[in-house]
């Protein structure tokens, strides 16, 4: 029996201190809609859930790179005086640094599948895409340029609503942009909206719902007040998908839900069709 005694090894595996065994942030993600856990690279270039088709949120420049053949930015350097709200200047500076944008919307002239359009893309990473004075000014100028140059407007909406730090000046942008939209439409020009996740608040209450054609990405959240606010007001539980674009489609507020990878082709087809009706 002595042959089998004290044979257990007492040596220990040494850990290489130079190796970082921590899983990097963002390596695995959960789909905000269906909850599926997936490896980051499974999303692909379009950052879409392989199970349900939900499009993860994109920064404005990412979307422009995926969507357009070429893009020339407008009004990149315009600035407006910001209100003296505590901490606002610091938040603006941080948002500009994180997104490489001057405001929560990127505007310019683009070619999509060979069709020239005036393009606006809101960015939810810039202070939740909130509607500030500069945001409204840039979108207004986009419509004015499009009207003067007889171009269709394609606007991707993504917003948490009015920017509270700017008070009434933020709310005024709803009417300001709406007036520019009306002038563009009176000129017989096409305004195409693409609703993305999330589109809420004052943006939903104004120019997001004024398009001649309204497209949407799958499972995007679109509404005015948040679900919890509504439930606390009416004291009822809201139905599943109450503020999702699938419900809006069923009730006539959206014309078509389009997978992100197909948006360029669909937008180009609609623009071409509108050109034919003008002849």
From Swiss-Prot:
Cellular component annotations (GO), alphabetically ordered: acetyl-CoA carboxylase complex
GO terms, molecular function: acetyl-CoA carboxylase activity; ATP binding; carboxyl- or carbamoyltransferase activity; zinc ion binding
Domain of life assignment: Bacteria
EC annotation from Swiss-Prot or TrEMBL: 2.1.3.15
Zinc finger (C4-type): 31-52
Keywords: ATP-binding, Cytoplasm, Fatty acid biosynthesis, Fatty acid metabolism, Lipid biosynthesis, Lipid metabolism, Metal-binding, Nucleotide-binding, Transferase, Zinc, Zinc-finger
Domain annotation CoA carboxyltransferase N-terminal: ranges: 27-279
Cofactor: record remark: Binds 1 zinc ion per subunit.
Compartment(s) where it occurs, according to its Swiss-Prot or TrEMBL record: Cytoplasm
One GO process term, biological-process aspect: fatty acid biosynthetic process
Similarity comment: family membership: Belongs to the AccD/PCCB family.
PANTHER family assigned to the protein according to its UniProt record, in alphabetical order: ACETYL-COENZYME A CARBOXYLASE CARBOXYL TRANSFERASE SUBUNIT BETA, CHLOROPLASTIC
Subunit structure: Acetyl-CoA carboxylase is a heterohexamer composed of biotin carboxyl carrier protein (AccB), biotin carboxylase (AccC) and two subunits each of ACCase subunit alpha (AccA) and ACCase subunit beta (AccD).
Function per UniProt: Component of the acetyl coenzyme A carboxylase (ACC) complex. Biotin carboxylase (BC) catalyzes the carboxylation of biotin on its carrier protein (BCCP) and then the CO(2) group is transferred by the transcarboxylase to acetyl-CoA to form malonyl-CoA.
Protein name in UniProt: Acetyl-coenzyme A carboxylase carboxyl transferase subunit beta
Gene designation per UniProt: accD
